[in-house]
Regions:
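C-terminal motif of bacterial Sec signal peptides marking the signal peptidase cleavage site
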Residues: 16-17
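Accessory carbohydrate-recognition regions in carbohydrate-active enzymes
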Residues: 21-416, 422-471, 479-505, 511-514, ...
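Bacterial N-terminal signal peptides that target proteins for export
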Residues: 1-8
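ATP-dependent phospho-/nucleotidyl transfer catalytic cores
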Residues: 476
């Protein structure tokens, strides 16, 4: 690997982005694609459109944890340009249909970094990279080929500028996927002298993934050679072939500076549907117009929030964060409405947009609540997608990827996500069916729930990560209870509300921590609240310091466990000042530490807002401003942990606007400390203007609040007031204050 300092690596990319001359009303100019490409951010780098099925970008040789998106700023290798990528996940997959332009004969393999001839890969220089929303460019040093990429929702458009060669080629790599992914069956066929098609079936995180494609070239190719990878591989005869791992070499003669365009459409259903997608979205070859359309699509979404600030770095961080919240969920259907369901069946011409990449354990906390504000037009489709997943697999999604349930992470995170849509009054789906899905998912006797129903909690001697699973189930039960109450189902409300209090079993009044409890009612010993052993203790990517606060649905009940507000507050204060040392084989996800508060991982994200809920909002303001200004940066390592499909950035977006939804569903956004002087947020019924008067780094404390010109004496703003639009005013000052009554 060619390692340099992060600042040097990113300089070329930043200059290239800034060298563009966008319109004065363009907000894409403030998106810095480098942010999150270093450290443990794991963000996607490449060309796409908002929520698109295609994420077209470079894929590097390494397959270790910091390369789950296929790209890391410390690396300068590329094996090709893949059409699917994940954004900020802690597990790798995808990288489907990887395309690599080459000159001369190559080895058909991923290759190793110690031997440039071991595969097709090439070095590139970050100084030659250009990246902005919907566009990516680089130069392949090994081949002297300039690469530019752009995309529509379902089509990737490649622009390759070749040197003179009688042996130029574009290679389709169907063998190499991402990290845990491996092909199970691949197919390539020649359709005519401009077109090839095929598919890639694979298994990995998504156990049965199927991506079909068709690819057209802007000039006739002179040859198609199909190679089989692996030890027994080699050239295969004919214009079509099916095997576990294939490469298709499409050959050309090129003159110096000649440009060849390649457009690749994908489908989860069939080659025929991939062709339909191409015909509908990209029938022509105008690269500049396609890139401009992608820029317009991104700008239209970014325009939903316009901020006023004199801090240029904060502006870049904000719009990059907003961009990151719209990479996924991604569309998982064709232009004719067809998609592949969780049961493996093809559903035809459905009347909604089907989505995938639901990282719900992460996103129910902030990314989904942000979506309900900024993307009301998408909420019926998101809800219908979840309901169809429920019908096909018998439960709401947990971590859904490419039509597959991965069951990744703990709890029932699809429940608060769907409940939030119901409680916020969204329509376009059957509310009774939604409640059925919520209830049945909450009653399914799997993943520790059978033990929970038997014992009233999940015993730590019978199930791994018992505390984490149970506490996530508890907050999901609360969400079910709120929907039951909304629909007049009193008995269900009482049942699920009581079950949502199961967290109390784990609270040890002696140590004042949540601890593992065995089937005989005994706390696990020995006990160390700083200790975390990844995948082998009572917590999930955390420890007792972090999980003790995972009761966002019943803060009053948690205060009661402590014996009152004074003891609760004292312990909460301690969280931020104790040692940040982690003991045991802790997960690297436990990052962004302030004391034992871990902003780099999701279970901590609501914790700073607990102060507002108990009448000490100045402490929320202190911590929110500290996190906004020290744990987010406009550098490659500008995120304190995994992006996690938009969650890390959604926290920034909401918190910088001045509020955050603490409870897992329902729409009370508690106040913190607005970062910007003014923000205009396009909402369901108009525009919400958020103004912070007398705002500065010193004047970070809310003194008073007005809503539509009238004094507002609540610690939160309700979703309905946000969605209605209007004017929310904060009067800021340098002294702590309380403007509300509890």
């Amino acid at each position: 690997m060619n390692l340099k300092s992060l600042s040097a690596l990113g300089a070329g990319l930043l200059l290239a982005a800034c060298s563009q001359a966008p319109r004065t009303d363009s907000l894409t100019q403030y998106v810095d694609m480098r942010i999150g490409t270093g450290g443990h951010g794991h963000v996607f780098m490449g060309a796409n459109v908002p929520f698109g099925a295609v994420q077209l970008g470079p894929t590097s040789i390494p397959q270790s944890w910091d390369w789950t998106s296929g790209y890391h700023i410390s690396d300068t290798t590329v094996i090709g340009f893949s059409h699917t990528h994940l954004n900020g996940t802690g597990i790798g997959d995808l990288f489907d249909v990887t395309v690599m332009p080459v000159v001369g004969q190559v080895t058909y393999a991923r290759g190793t970094e110690d031997d440039p001839q071991s595969g097709m890969w090439s070095y590139f220089s970050h100084a030659n990279e250009k990246a902005r929303p919907g566009y990516y460019a680089t130069r392949l040093d090994r081949y002297g080929i300039d690469v530019e990429l752009t995309a529509t929702k379902r089509v990737g458009l490649h622009k390759y500028t070749f040197p003179a060669s009688a042996d130029a080629a574009v290679v389709f790599d169907l063998e190499n996927g991402g990290c845990w992914d491996a092909p199970t069956e691949t197919f390539i066929e020649r359709a005519d002298d401009h077109t090839i098609s095929g598919y890639r079936y694979s298994t990995g995180w998504a156990k049965d993934q199927r991506v079909y494609f068709t690819a057209e070239f802007s000039k006739p190719f002179k040859s198609l050679a199909i190679y089989e990878g692996g030890e027994d591989g080699g050239l295969r005869e004919g214009d079509s072939f099916r095997a576990e791992r294939l490469y298709g070499r499409v050959g050309f003669d090129t003159s110096a500076g000649e440009t060849i365009y390649v457009k690749v459409a994908i489908s989860p259903v069939s080659i025929e549907n991939a062709r339909l997608n191409m015909q509908a979205e990209l029938p022509g070859w105008d690269f500049e117009a396609t890139a401009a359309a992608a820029d317009r699509a991104w700008n239209a979404e970014l325009q939903k929030v316009r901020i006023e600030t004199s801090d240029d770095a904060a502006r870049r961080i904000f719009y990059t964060a907003l961009y990151h919240t719209m990479v996924a969920p991604s569309e998982f259907c064709d232009v004719n409405g067809d998609y592949r369901g969780s049961d493996g069946k093809i559903y035809r011409a459905v009347p909604f947009v089907n989505y995938t990449t639901f990282s719900l354990w992460d996103t129910y906390r902030a990314a989904q609540p942000l979506m309900t504000i900024l993307h009301p037009e998408k909420m019926p489709d998101i809800a219908n997608t979840m309901l169809h997943i429920y019908r096909q697999q018998g439960k709401l999604p947990v971590w859904h990827l490419m039509g597959n349930e991965t069951d990744c992470m703990v709890g029932n995170p699809g429940i608060p996500a769907l409940a939030d849509a119901v409680l916020k009054g969204y329509g376009g789906f059957d509310r009774e069916q939604a409640y059925e899905a919520l209830k049945q998912s909450a009653m399914l006797g799997e993943r520790g729930m059978d033990l929970r129903m038997k014992y009233g909690y999940i015993p730590c001697d019978l199930f791994n990560e018992a505390v984490a699973y149970d506490m996530e189930y508890a907050l999901a039960d609360w969400a079910v209870a709120q929907v039951a109450k909304e629909l007049g189902k009193t008995a269900d409300y009482d049942h699920f509300l009581e079950r949502s209090k199961s967290y109390r079993h784990f609270f040890d009044p002696q140590t004042r921590f949540m601890r593992g409890l065995d089937s005989k009612g005994r706390f696990r010993t020995p006990f160390n609240p700083f200790r975390s052993t990844h995948r082998a203790d009572d917590y999930c990517e955390g420890n007792a310091w972090q999980y003790t606060w995972l009761v966002p649905h019943d803060v009053e009940g948690l205060i009661g466990c402590f014996g009152g507000k004074e003891a609760f507050t004292g312990k909460l204060d301690s969280l931020f000042v104790v040692s940040s040392v982690l003991e045991g084989a802790a997960s690297p996800d436990i990052s962004g530490l302030i004391g034992q508060y871990a902003h780099g991982n999701e279970p901590s994200h609501h914790v700073v807002y607990l102060y507002t809920m108990i009448g000490q909002p100045w402490k929320t303001a202190d911590k929110v401003r500290e996190i906004l200004t020290t744990l987010y940066h406009d550098r490659p390592d500008g995120l304190s942990g995994n992006e996690d499909v938009g969650q890390m950035s959604a926290w920034y977006v909401l918190s910088s606007l001045g509020f955050y939804q603490v409870e897992p569903a329902g729409g009370r956004y508690f106040f913190g400390s607005p970062l910007f002087d003014k923000a205009e947020v396009r909402v369901r019924d108009g525009v919400l203007t958020v103004t912070a008067h007398n705002n500065s780094a010193a004047n970070k404390y809310i003194q008073a609040v007005k809503l539509n010109g009238k004094p507002y004496t609540k610690p939160y703003i309700a979703f309905d007031d946000i969605a209605a639009g209007g004017v929310l005013e904060f009067e800021m000052g340098a002294e702590p204050a309380v403007w509300y009554e509890l």
